[in-house]
Amino acid sequence: AALAMGLQYLGMSEHGPTSPGGPHNFFFSNYKVIPRIYDREENTGRVIPKPDGSLRLLCGVEANICSTNGELDLEERYLQKMDYALASIHPFAFTAGSRKENTLASVRAFQNPYVKILGHPDDGRFPLDYDELVREARQAQAVLEVNNSSLNPQSARQGGRENITELLKTCMKYDQPVIMGTDSHMCFAIGAFDDAEQLMRELE
């Protein structure tokens, strides 16, 4: 799907081990055997590993934030081997606290030297102080995700559009970069940034 869309990079970030049905730590250790560059075979059109290919695969993790200390569910010895790592709050791994507590947990998570992305900081079930979050992210040289799936009316996250709008306005205030994510749980959602792009254009 990524090659068909002409994408140059595809990030794969499996959820951390505490997720229901989540992978064991060994899953992440096994990333070392996965080729990172792909293209289509000329004769068959099959997608194959190819050193000079046009698509680079990045193997990462979406680690679960487990406490207000920013504790993650994947040890640093695994995190340091990832191509990239993001951290996110999920209800199965983190008990919602006050706005201050949720913000503290998020900030401490991306202060981890191996985490440079905070995933979907837009769920109304876990309210955040965006002003503090953005200032701390800027200082830590971390980026905040604009999650396309959070804008889907069927998303379990609450207040996605309103919260992402507030987040983006705060990022604009502090000149803080963001990263768009599709949160693709199926191949047909790869590269689908339509809702996020539309919202960002509206705020230009």
Regions found by a protein language model. Give the residues of each.
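Histidine/acidic-residue-rich catalytic or RNA/ligand-binding cores of hydrolases
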Residues: 21-25, 127-135, 154-170, 187-200
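C-terminal active-site rim and adjoining tail of enzyme catalytic domains
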Residues: 149, 168, 177, 181
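His/Asp/Glu-enriched short active-site or ligand-binding loop at hydrolase and phosphoryl-transfer sites
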Residues: 143-156
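Residue-level detector of anion-binding/catalytic polar loops
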Residues: 8-9, 56, 143, 177
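Short acidic/histidine-rich active-site segments
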Residues: 15, 176-190
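Ser/Thr-glycine-rich phosphate-binding loops at phosphate-binding pockets of nucleotides
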Residues: 1, 9-14
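Extended substrate/RNA-proximal surfaces in nucleic-acid metabolism proteins
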Residues: 16-146, 201-203
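Short gly/pro/ser/thr-enriched loop/turn and capping motifs at secondary-structure boundaries
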Residues: 18, 93-94, 151-153, 186-188
